Amino acid sequence: MTLDDSSLQKFGFIKRETLGSINIDPLQTGGLLTGAAKQALVEWGDGYSVCDFCGGVLDLVKKPPIHDFVHKALPEFLGCDEARVTNGARESKFAVMHSMGKPGDWVVLDGLAHYSSYVAAERAGLNIEVVPHAGSPEYHLDPGRYGKAIEEVTKENGKPPVLALVTYPDGSYGNIPDAAKIASVCHEYDVPLLLNGAYSVGRMPVSAKEIGADFIVGSGHKSMAASGPVGVLGVSEEYAPVVFRKSVHNKVKEIELLGCTARGATVMTLMASFPEVVKRTRNWDQEVENARWFSSRLEGMGFIQRGQKPHSHDLMFFEAPGFYEISQKVKNGRYFLYRELKERNIHGIKSGLTKYFKLSTFGLGKEKLGTVADAFEDILKKYENI
């Protein structure tokens, strides 16, 4: 590529095509910036902006009040003893796995774990034992199967896994497993538990201590109304010295965090949205009620919701036989649904999906959810005679 003025134009300001749409994308509904975060994005957007008064450790910066956010607010919010800001939930998971295990050790993952949990384990050199789910239609995760998985690893390798992980909820079906029971089972074998709360921390009330988890991770850009990439990590007092150990070469730098993590706009938007994020978790019962109402509307049209029922999260997976049938009959049928929703200013179902898709109802409220449900119904009626 020749870097002349003409070719460089494509990399200037780019207008976002979907901005202003009703957004039902599970990746995005919990990450929409608050008004305060949008202001912070402009105010603190310059590179290392938060380092105007830095003594060498990001989480100890007092101006802006990152220290109080990380060491006072986050532990209370996450229900943990020590907390840090990271560059994302996956980076949080890797920090725990890399510090807790050595290459060749084993980790136990649930059968609905996110791909990044697998990749984090691989990067840390860990082997993986999977706790299977029960399959369709609910994909239930039996806490007792964690015990069996731990026993299997111990039998084959002579020692238990260094860590177990549960996804709370999973990113496919939005199932919320019995994490407290899973923690209890793991602790019977002296195996610590990591709670992957990428879709819960910032959306719903969740406390590592109440659940019994030794580690908790969250995603700022997925569920805490922050500009990404940014995440959070909470650790119990027992394991904090392991995960947050310091370098022998630079004595203030924590090894697993590579010294400092989210600098500038990411941490500042996370902080700016935090007051509103705390408040919105108190409205979780209403979010669940809205999700169930929406699911009921769709099932009345012939859609089939997979996963836990009654559902307890905004992320839901649907089978859509009506849409799929239409896609088999119309021109360029794979993309008809995307086109129809785009015309109605609705974004979030991936282009090409008609038979199965997931969506999120988080933060939309009954009025917008009604608009989406009405749109689905209108589309079905539009093609009912083809």
UniProtKB/Swiss-Prot annotation:
Class of enzymatic activity (EC top level): transferase
For this UniProt entry, the molecular function terms from Gene Ontology, in alphabetical order, are:
Sep-tRNA:Cys-tRNA synthase activity
Leader sequence range is: none
Alphabetical UniProt keywords: Protein biosynthesis, Pyridoxal phosphate, Transferase
Give the catalytic activity. Answer: O-phospho-L-seryl-tRNA(Cys) + hydrogen sulfide + H(+) = L-cysteinyl-tRNA(Cys) + phosphate
Q: Which InterPro entries match?
A: PyrdxlP-dep_Trfase, PyrdxlP-dep_Trfase_major, PyrdxlP-dep_Trfase_small, Sep_Cys-tRNA_synth_arc, SepSecS/SepCysS
Look up the record and give one Gene Ontology term from the biological process aspect.
Answer: translation
CDD domains, alphabetized: SepCysS
The entry's pyridoxal 5'-phosphate-binding residues are A89, R90, N196, S219, G220, H221
EC numbers for this chain: 2.5.1.73
The Swiss-Prot or TrEMBL record lists the needed cofactor(s) as: pyridoxal 5'-phosphate
Q: Which residues carry this modification: N6-(pyridoxal phosphate)lysine?
A: K222
Q: What does the sequence similarity comment in the record state about its family?
A: Belongs to the SepCysS family.
**NCBIfam families xrefs:** PRK09331.1 (NF006810), SepCysS (TIGR02539)
Subunit info here reads:
Homodimer. Interacts with SepRS.
Described purpose of this protein according to its UniProt entry: Converts O-phospho-L-seryl-tRNA(Cys) (Sep-tRNA(Cys)) to L-cysteinyl-tRNA(Cys) (Cys-tRNA(Cys)).
Q: What is this protein called?
A: O-phospho-L-seryl-tRNA:Cys-tRNA synthase
**Provenance organism:** Methanosarcina mazei (strain ATCC BAA-159 / DSM 3647 / Goe1 / Go1 / JCM 11833 / OCM 88)
What taxonomic lineage is listed for the species of origin? Archaea, Methanobacteriati, Methanobacteriota, Stenosarchaea group, Methanomicrobia
